[in-house]
A protein has these predicted regions:
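Non-catalytic, usually N-terminal nucleic-acid engagement modules in DNA/RNA processing proteins
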Residues: 1-89, 174-183
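Alpha-helix-loop-beta-strand connector modules within alpha/beta enzyme cores
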Residues: 38-48, 89-96, 132-154
């Protein structure tokens, strides 16, 4: 399993590099201007559209900086499957056929709309409620690969090929945290 560390500013990127981190996740909002300066410092860069993004700017970034990242999510809208599907289709029409789809809301219904090829990588986005999230994760088909966006809490579930530390960062920024003891 790959763990992608979120790094959305220069200081965090430098600290992660000094710690020997190999995989980073970057928000377009914070990386569009300087991804070419640090792409060779990490083995794998995963780009996400982030919140409050501009779809046109993100799509231009995806096309112009493709050689600097390994993975990039599609432009998605939190909790909104229909809007997320609309952007997925637009990207395909624009020739941006390498983005990783992001499931929002009802994962299985969203998958039925996408119809990804077996062994495709798919990101799990937002669902309201932890019970619903856990139920939806149990129903996921086994013929796909999954990245858990801010789903590192479920690292033991073993359904994910990769997860990221977005949830860790948001907790740290909120100045509220719990210490995980591994039990």
């Amino acid at each position: 399993m790959k763990l992608y560390f979120n790094a959305n500013n220069k200081a965090t990127l430098e600290a992660l590099e000094q710690c020997g981190v190999k995989n980073v996740m970057l928000s377009h909002r914070y990386s569009y201007a300087n991804i070419n300066k640090f792409h060779d410092r990490f083995e794998s860069i995963f780009v996400v559209a982030g919140t409050k993004g501009d779809p046109d700017k993100y799509h231009e970034f995806l096309k112009s900086k493709k050689e600097y990242y390994e993975y990039a999510t599609q432009f998605d809208v939190y909790y909104d499957m229909d809007a997320t599907l609309k952007y997925w289709r637009q990207e395909k029409e624009m020739g941006i056929d390498w983005t990783v789809p992001v499931l929002q809301g009802n994962y299985t219904h969203h998958l039925s709309q996408l119809r990804p090829e077996p062994n495709s990588l798919v990101c799990l986005g937002e669902i309201k409620g932890i019970a619903e999230l856990e139920d939806q994760m149990r129903k996921l088909p086994g013929n796909l690969r999954y990245h858990g966006l801010a789903k590192s809490k479920f690292i033991k579930n073993r359904i994910f090929e990769s997860v990221d530390t977005a949830a860790w960062i948001s907790v740290a920024l909120a100045k509220k945290s719990e210490i995980w003891t591994g039990s």
